[in-house]
Design a protein with these regions (language model features):
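Bacterial N-terminal signal peptides that target proteins for export
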Residues: 1-11
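N-terminal leader/targeting pre-sequences
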Residues: 14-66, 71-174
Length: 174
């Protein structure tokens, strides 16, 4: 009986060791978004999805129209300019834009479309990032952030698609 208990415990520990990192990566993570005045305007959720990392955005209080939205390279969001978030997340050193043949940055997304009531509810999937701690991982040392810009992203111009000022930001953290 004791031999069985030790064997069972060994199997459990082996499975936990083998599945542990994947289990940690598989968790949904909520990103609290704030505007340039430091007020909360909504949230985003990242989660593993078939083909990459899913991003679900739910925000209010923005100007109607299209807005650039990107993962940025630093896990800081200091209002009002959010310059502390650094540039776009770009571990491969590519050019900006989904329509750029020399791109895109790992942090690039299609535009976020805000309705006439100032709210946006959108979902995207990025095959260029992971929920790991290195390489293309959003949980790497120094962190990352999600930034919404004032203007539409033209999807081709370096470094940020002419998407204008940073109007909302959220730190990506577990």
């Amino acid at each position: 009986m004791k031999r069985f208990d030790r064997t069972a415990a060994g199997v459990v520990f082996a499975l936990a060791a083998a599945l542990g990192p994947r289990g940690a990566e598989a968790r949904d993570v909520t990103i609290e978004l704030m505007n340039a005045q430091g007020q909360p305007i909504g949230h985003a959720t990242i989660a593993p999805e078939s083909g990459g990392v899913g991003l679900r955005v739910d925000v209010t209080g923005l100007a109607p129209g299209s807005h650039g939205i990107h993962f940025h390279e630093v896990g800081k969001c200091e209002p009002p300019s959010f310059a502390s978030a650094g540039g776009h997340f770009n571990p491969d050193g590519k050019h900006h834009g989904l329509d750029n043949p020399a791109g895109p940055h790992a942090g690039d997304f299609p535009n976020l479309v805000v309705g006439p009531d100032g709210s946006a509810h959108a979902s995207f999937v990025s095959p260029r990032v992971t929920l790991a701690t290195d390489g293309h991982g959003l949980f790497r040392s120094g962190g990352t952030s999600l930034v919404i810009h004032a203007d539409p992203d033209d999807e081709k111009t370096d470094p940020a698609g002419n998407s204008g000022a940073r109007i909302a930001c959220g730190v990506i953290a577990r």
